[in-house]
UniProtKB/Swiss-Prot annotation:
GO terms for cellular component: cytosol. It comes from Streptococcus suis (strain 05ZYH33). It is an enzyme of class 2 (transferase). Belongs to the PNP/UDP phosphorylase family. Homohexamer; trimer of homodimers. This is Purine nucleoside phosphorylase DeoD-type.
């Protein structure tokens, strides 16, 4: 048992999906895992362990933002021995050619957060995905005929900021695919503790095409492509 997770030793698999929304974790457990058992309800951050195609897999919500995912990922890695962590979440498109419901695999994640700089004030460290997971996820998505983009994303500390909104659009002109709030922290912890990390996002809205949008219920229950890719990537040899 850790500070924020009530699981006992052995109740969490060494590979895990990390949606931001705890209700999406519940949805994944109920619709994709066999014999799923809930191992955490602390702060309503639901976590489950079950099997997917015969492989033991866990799924747990992380909440929104870099501080929240940092807490849960840190404890999963250091207290429960998790070795593969894949974020499955939503993002806003910054590119004209990246549309709602399409997938983005974050090759790297820039960030305006200063949290990583607490550890490394002298450097701006690049936060990158584990290449093995990235490569597997890309080929799995292609085999499943899913429209998939690979590139940089922005992990932002702010959701509502008119000033950052215009700056984020400029990042899109530099090829940044989308904006979200967690990937950079997950990648940093992967590098720090020597585990494999990847972020797979579904585009839920677009900053360049505002008419493209999805509802909260759709974001919770219908973005199944990234869930399939995430699970297949976790169990791929």
């Amino acid at each position: 048992m850790s500070i924020h997770i009530s699981a006992k030793p052995g109740e969490i698999a060494d590979k895990i999906l990390l949606p931001g929304d705890p209700l999406r974790a519940k949805f994944i457990a109920e619709n994709f895992l066999e014999d799923a058992v809930c191992f955490n309800e602390v702060r309503n951050m639901f976590g489950y362990t079950g099997t997917y195609k015969g492989h033991r897999v866990s799924v747990m919500g992380t909440g929104m933002g870099i501080p929240s995912i940092s807490i849960y990922a840190h404890e999963l890695i250091n207290e429960y021995g998790v070795k593969k962590l894949i974020r499955v979440g939503t993002a806003g498109s910054l590119n004209e050619d990246v549309h709602v419901r399409e997938l983005v695999l974050a090759q790297a994640a820039a960030t305006n957060s200063r949290m990583i700089n607490i550890d490394w004030p002298e450097y701006d460290l690049p936060q990158i995905a584990d290449f093995d997971l990235l490569d597997k996820a890309y080929h799995i998505a292609k085999e499943l005929n899913m429209t998939t983009h690979v590139g940089n994303v922005l992990s932002s500390d702010s959701f509502y900021s008119p000033k950052l909104f215009s700056r984020n659009l400029e990042l899109g002109q530099l090829g940044v695919k989308a904006v979200e709030m967690e990937a950079a922290a997950l990648y940093y912890l992967g590098a720090k503790f020597g585990v494999q990390t990847l972020a797979i996002m579904t585009i839920s809205d677009s900053l360049v095409n505002p008419e493209e949008d999805t509802t909260a219920e759709e974001r919770q229950n219908t973005f199944t492509d990234m869930m399939k890719v995430g699970l297949e990537t976790l169990i791929a040899e």
